[in-house]
Amino acid sequence: QVVLETQLSAGLDPDVAVAVYRSVAEGVANALRHGRAEHVTVRVTAADSGAIHVDVLDDGAGGPIVPGVGLSSLQRRAENLGGRLSIGSNPPTGVHLHLELPTEAVA
């Protein structure tokens, strides 16, 4: 089961929208493939600071985070857009992927 929660009042810069999409896709795929999660919650919210926050939380097995090609690509994309990506795990409560991006891509 995947639950999507959004709180956005406006559209996103196309580069930011792609980064949001890819982070959600990677987070959900990893939760199901590696964590064997039964429930995944995806939250996309706009902060008062003008940042976009993306959280992907799962109830999978958790464990050590081993960055592969997908997570490394997300990290680079976030940094190139002036944002940051963090991933945490506290077994056995699953994994929390958090992406913070500016509303508009950095030129």
Feature locations, PLM:
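Coiled-coil dimerization/phosphotransfer module
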Residues: 1-107
